[in-house]
């Protein structure tokens, strides 16, 4: 069973969340909150500022990718991208090949495991490069003189019951830094529009938009490699050979330099947390439908962490664990009322139930490999497991990692982020994900 501290925190968490949801419902009913631009973060939530310098092995920056909406992306670039064979990567490989008896099992922490050794190796300075190569803004800037690696890209969709959470929240920043390091990937945390200002399908459309933006960035970067200084249609276009950017006569950058230098979009993974899992699964379906139209972007796998699934016919866990920790069923129902348009409210809505009879999109057999993470004390667990089972029936690699004595968001909630179980979950995800992002080749194809 979860500890006393978790139980107490859960009580206060649910009270505050229920109060917020009820306020949003009343305001939405009275005044209406529809706003096409939307909001991607709440003013009362703790956020972590982006830091383009390498701090604890990761540099971050925020990109506002759609001028018509509040859609943003926070990029998490691991320091391992600066060297073809970083020492930290070798250490990780050695760690991942330890005997299984020395690792936590997939159901939670192994309390007999020794604490990880402190890293004593020398590190680069806070910018990951020599001072003479720094850009004026003081953060990391790719350089043609420096060795670099192409890393897989992971699109991450945060949780928060559709109405809260953000790509730059303190908890999400910590989690994405951890994932970027253990998986050795560039993480793009998506700041999708929240409800009720923007109801379904806004958040889902934002996820697809980021995937297309990633493809556009890759194509622009390729174009930049062959483009010299020239005039196109009377407009001066310049090539910056150090950062791989294309700028117009006004100096506006069209290419994101970190992605141009380090991203390999042909090895793209989706990771969704709670309601973000619903978004990730939707984006995966759209990627399968698009097929080669998305090239060079290729979604090779997805990770669904305790997805926010529900349905009209309650499962055993939905009945037995309805009043479980943090996001219990009554509170989650309020969240769904704020997210789904009133005329579409139905627990068998395709956004809510992945196995609904009215599900659209490609057949399940075409879905990418899917890792599902569930918690023992989460009322949503059975439906997530059922979805995984249906994928396995059509020969999709779809394992389930179930963690004992765990609660919903046990690996991503602010209070629980530094627990051994949260660290173990990230490491288990990394082991599975690396099967599909290895440079030795991909096992999955549309």
From Swiss-Prot:
It is an enzyme of class 3 (hydrolase). GO terms for molecular function: carboxylesterase activity. Its EC number is 3.1.1.1. Pfam families: Abhydrolase_3. It comes from the Eukaryota. Residues 87-105 have a biased composition (Basic and acidic residues). Residues 84-131 are annotated as: Disordered. The active site is at residues 274, 378, 408. It catalyses: a carboxylic ester + H2O = an alcohol + a carboxylate + H(+). The keyword Hydrolase applies. The keyword tRNA processing does not apply. Expressed in roots, leaves, stems, flowers and siliques. Keywords: Hydrolase, Serine esterase. A motif (Involved in the stabilization of the negatively charged intermediate by the formation of the oxyanion hole) lies at residues 158-160. Signal peptide: none annotated. PANTHER family: ARYLACETAMIDE DEACETYLASE (PTHR23024), CARBOXYLESTERASE 16-RELATED (PTHR23024:SF455). Carboxylesterase acting on esters with varying acyl chain length. Belongs to the 'GDXG' lipolytic enzyme family. This is Probable carboxylesterase 16. It comes from Arabidopsis thaliana.
